[in-house]
Amino acid sequence: MFDSTLNPLWQRYILAVQEEVKPALGCTEPISLALAAAVAAAELEGPVERVEAWVSPNLMKNGLGVTVPGTGMVGLPIAAALGALGGNANAGLEVLKDATAQAIADAKALLAAGKVSVKIQEPCDEILFSRAKVWNGEKWACVTIVGGHTNIVHIETHDGVVFTQQACVAEGEQESPLTVLSRTTLAEILKFVNEVPFAAIRFILDSAKLNCALSQEGLSGKWGLHIGATLEKQCERGLLAKDLSSSIVIRTSAASDARMGGATLPAMSNSGSGNQGITATMPVVVVAEHFGADDERLARALMLSHLSAIYIHNQLPRLSALCAATTAAMGAAAGMAWLVDGRYETISMAISSMIGDVSGMICDGASNSCAMKVSTSASAAWKAVLMALDDTAVTGNEGIVAHDVEQSIANLCALASHSMQQTDRQIIEIMASKAR
């Protein structure tokens, strides 16, 4: 429950963060399909004997090359099979957290028997769409998720419709937190971060706890491309400086290594993405530790980072050709800049420089290489902060950057929402040809 004395707008900010910053086990696109399969299996009479699934092109893109936690296998078919046979239908993005060794073995056997199929839904106007249909003999259950990774819109079985999400909004119902957030500004977000009672935002410290554990696991060197562990090793060899900049990159990329490599630890996600959550969290944590920040300062910096990342990403399609680690890192830049000097001017300059730097990075599907993009984005964020501290930034005379940071963000998001749609189609076409 909220403190009734809190500013109503601040309450919506907090709700937005609570809705968009959640624990997630495994890359969220395969996990969305696993959840659909798990919920369908829960509705089915008898054990699952066969799984059919259909996904949007964007979800297929983000599911082709990523490891499903605990399985050592990549791709959507194993996610669908394990969700159906070992998923917890009530666990949301942590649907696979209780999957047993037996369930994993059964899922692999179902896959080997050719009883699992995943296809692109055609036609499909939705960017995020997953549908799983599970069978037991002639009996079946089908679940459809649309728009958000856990947004179930339809449940149906051989006996009829079980649930359909109502599209209409009841009269007098409050606007969603994200709708409210779309009308705010970075300046208003900063005012909130500076003035909100610590007790109201203490919960955001959980993002540091979860993502730091994932980072520590990544530093073991056995996950994904082990970028974090490799860079740490190069520090020991004297090929890379042991400094704050290196620590930011190493600890952030290590968390992504573990995440994309299939570690069975949850990430605290942001905007439906574990890597975005990692990118919005770890650079801020490292800088906070460097300055000896207490829990309250860390919580305020993390709240600024996560809320800014949500604010920017809310102006984008849920999935697109733009690598959203870059927009999450803009949030991290805000959080790090706040820790150093707290000025709005520094924060806005850092974000503007980020937009002038890494805006062209494409999303070519979830995979181990996401950790490369996470490390690049984290490095760019700290560089932008250092520039801003010296009163230097990419100016409104250059490229898509405008004189006003809000317009710069709008320009970036317009590119991703419109012009990069053809880029997305080309990426999906290339990836589909490789999968044949």
UniProtKB/Swiss-Prot annotation:
Induction: Transcription induced by L-cysteine (in vivo), under control of DecR. Member of the dlsT(yhaO)-yhaM operon. It comes from the Bacteria. Disruption phenotype: Slightly increased sensitivity to excess L-cysteine, the effect is more pronounced in M9 minimal medium. Cells produce about 9% of wild-type levels of hydrogen sulfide in the presence of excess cysteine. GO terms for biological process: cysteine catabolic process; L-cysteine catabolic process to pyruvate; response to L-cysteine. InterPro entries: Ser_deHydtase-like_asu, UPF0597. GO terms for molecular function: L-cysteine desulfhydrase activity. Belongs to the UPF0597 family. HAMAP family: UPF0597 (MF_01845). Plays a role in L-cysteine detoxification; it has been speculated to be a cysteine desulfhydrase. This is UPF0597 protein YhaM. It comes from Escherichia coli (strain K12). The gene is yhaM.
